């Protein structure tokens, strides 16, 4: 009888061990598969967001901004404290005096 057949299932015994590195690598692979593609916004939506942004800056209102970052949609809430036209970015001051710098090309939605 062949030596491989005599071992039975012992050939695969080593694969039963699962190291923390294996688990971390599998979770990372699963997270990468779940990443979203950045949606493409139509011009009407961009114009609506621009008007909402201008109104929030003019009247110092709180806004909620949804952004696309690293394959995920992240929301932040606060008041606009600075608009950088050259960098096309908005600085938002959150509830706990946190500053968020959001690039306008990553913004998906703005709600008053």
UniProtKB/Swiss-Prot annotation:
InterPro entries: YolD. Pfam families: YolD. This is Uncharacterized protein YqjX. It comes from Bacillus subtilis (strain 168). The lineage of its organism: Bacteria, Bacillati, Bacillota, Bacilli, Bacillales.
């Amino acid at each position: 009888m062949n030596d491989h057949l005599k071992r039975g299932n012992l050939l695969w015994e080593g694969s039963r061990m699962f190291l923390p590195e294996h688990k971390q690598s599998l979770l990372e692979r699963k997270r990468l598969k779940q990443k979203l593609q950045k949606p493409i916004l139509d011009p009407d939506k961009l114009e609506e967001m621009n008007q909402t942004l201008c109104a929030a800056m003019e009247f110092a209102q709180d806004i909620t901004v949804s952004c696309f970052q690293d394959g995920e949609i992240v929301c932040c809430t606060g008041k606009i404290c600075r608009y950088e036209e050259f960098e096309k970015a908005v600085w938002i001051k959150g509830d706990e005096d946190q500053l968020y710098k959001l690039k306008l090309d990553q913004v998906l939605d703005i709600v008053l």
